[in-house]
Amino acid sequence: MSNMVEVPIFIAILSFIVMCIGELLAYYSVSLKYKYEFEAISFGFIFGVATLILIPKSYSNMFVLYVILGMITVYLIEKYLAYCPLSKKYCVECDNLEENRIKFIYPISFFIHTFIDGLIIAVSYISEIGLPLYLAILMHKLPAGFVLISPLKGVYKNPLYPGVFVSFGTVLGTIVGLVTLKDVSTKILLAFSGGVFLGAFLMLAPHIYEHKEEKTFLYILLGYILVGIIALH
């Protein structure tokens, strides 16, 4: 493995570690005081990466089709595979059906999310985008780990075991992406990734307003501006 290939692997491992730290904080009930502000900045960053870097660099014949496919992929995952008990006013006294969904469906849907993060890291390396995409993944890992473990504490004796497995999806996705995507057109990868990021922003950013309406737009704008500054260099 060349030194260059080691970079995305390092980013994937770092993402795994950061997410595990978020899980530990949730496990020991350490509050993330600015969790929603940080998430808002990361969503703005994701939106900026999609609209200022990925989609413009993917311009080619039929690139819009792949952007739309990326957005549809996110929509289908959110609609049919994703499950978040926190959005359903989760409590430890849920009935057995709800408990089983939290115990099994929730971590599986989260694993899909982390695996896709890994694929995006691989795309960042293959397409030579580098830093902006790496940061977009890293920035939301701490709150993601916190959100993952919070409901699992009510259904697992030790929720860190499934948490670590879910977090490892980023490393696994990166390895799979580096092996399987290297011969795919860079333009297609960039367009599809741009669609994924744009879809993720449109699906997830509104949830921030449910928890933190105050100054949310400003935090999203800050994340977007950060990408603009990076894109100029």
Curated annotation (Swiss-Prot):
Chief localization: membrane
Annotated GO CC locations: membrane; plasma membrane
Transmembrane helix as UniProt keyword: yes
Biological process (GO), any one: zinc ion transmembrane transport
Topological relation to the membrane, as annotated: Multi-pass membrane protein
One MF annotation (Gene Ontology) recorded for this entry: zinc ion transmembrane transporter activity
Domain of life: Archaea
Regions annotated as coiled coil: none
Compartments in which it is found: Cell membrane
Transmembrane intervals: 7-27, 36-56, 62-82, 119-139, 159-179, 188-208
Signal peptide interval: none
Keywords associated with the record: Cell membrane, Membrane, Transmembrane, Transmembrane helix
Keyword check for Nucleotide-binding: no
UniProt-listed PANTHER family: METAL HOMEOSTASIS FACTOR ATX2, ZINC/IRON TRANSPORTER
Name used for this protein in its record: Uncharacterized protein MJ1036
Organism: Methanocaldococcus jannaschii (strain ATCC 43067 / DSM 2661 / JAL-1 / JCM 10045 / NBRC 100440)
